[in-house]
């Protein structure tokens, strides 16, 4: 497909369908920019030019103060995905938002993403969430990293995601003994 400059894209876009574009933003400002963008689209009555604005995030479990906490992480920090009809007016609306540094592509040619690329991003987000959903699984081998059983290897018998705790069976004097540990007291064996 031949490269088009921004003028060609803008002049032909009235008849084009909406396409996905990637906007580069200031780091950490993605949600604020999305909010401002939605306000400006509404205020300027341009909702016909825009379909969707995505800041791809996934949930991850982190252990903080011995508690399992769900935290949102950005899949693509400093980037926003936007499905829009690229016209001169819509291009300027996006480009003039404070914190937007530009569209992905060259200065004169914003690069449109394919639907399959967008689908891959959505699948990657889902995969990261599914992977995180089970930090530890029953039957998994772990090593105790702190406490009186440090360096002992055992098998996970129970997992309590809410309390961030495990019941691990370790061998003490040749006898399998269950001990309760926090997620921070063990590490997975590779």
From Swiss-Prot:
Where do the KOW domain residues begin and end? 138-166
Q: Where are the transmembrane segments?
A: none
Q: Which InterPro entries match?
A: KOW, NGN, NGN-like_dom, NGN_dom_sf, NusG-like, Rib_uL2_dom2, Transcrpt_antiterm_NusG, Transcrpt_antiterm_NusG_bac_CS
Query: Which Gene Ontology cellular-component terms appear in the entry?
Result: cytosol
- Any idea which UniProt keywords this protein has? Transcription, Transcription antitermination, Transcription regulation, Transcription termination
Function, as annotated: Participates in transcription elongation, termination and antitermination.
What does the sequence similarity comment in the record state about its family?
Belongs to the NusG family.
Show the HAMAP family listed in the entry: NusG
Q: What is this protein called?
A: Transcription termination/antitermination protein NusG
The organism is Rickettsia bellii (strain RML369-C)
């Amino acid at each position: 497909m031949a490269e088009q400059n921004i003028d060609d894209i803008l002049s032909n876009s009235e008849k084009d369908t909406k396409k996905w574009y990637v906007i580069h933003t200031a780091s950490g400002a993605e949600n604020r920019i999305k909010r401002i963008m939605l306000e400006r689209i509404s205020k300027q009555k341009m909702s016909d030019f825009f379909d969707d604005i995505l800041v791809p995030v996934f949930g991850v479990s982190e252990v903080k103060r011995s508690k399992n906490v769900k935290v949102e992480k950005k899949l693509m920090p400093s980037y926003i995905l936007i499905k829009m009809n690229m016209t001169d007016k819509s291009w300027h609306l996006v480009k003039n938002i404070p914190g937007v540094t530009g569209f992905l592509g060259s200065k004169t040619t914003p690069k449109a993403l394919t639907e399959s690329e967008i689908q891959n991003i959505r699948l990657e987000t889902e995969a990261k969430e599914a992977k995180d959903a089970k930090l530890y699984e029953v039957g998994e081998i772990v090593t105790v990293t702190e406490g009186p059983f440090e360096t002992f290897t055992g098998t996970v018998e129970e997992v309590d995601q809410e309390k961030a705790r495990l019941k691990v069976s370790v061998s003490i004097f040749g006898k399998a003994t269950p001990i309760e540990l926090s997620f921070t007291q063990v590490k997975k064996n590779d």
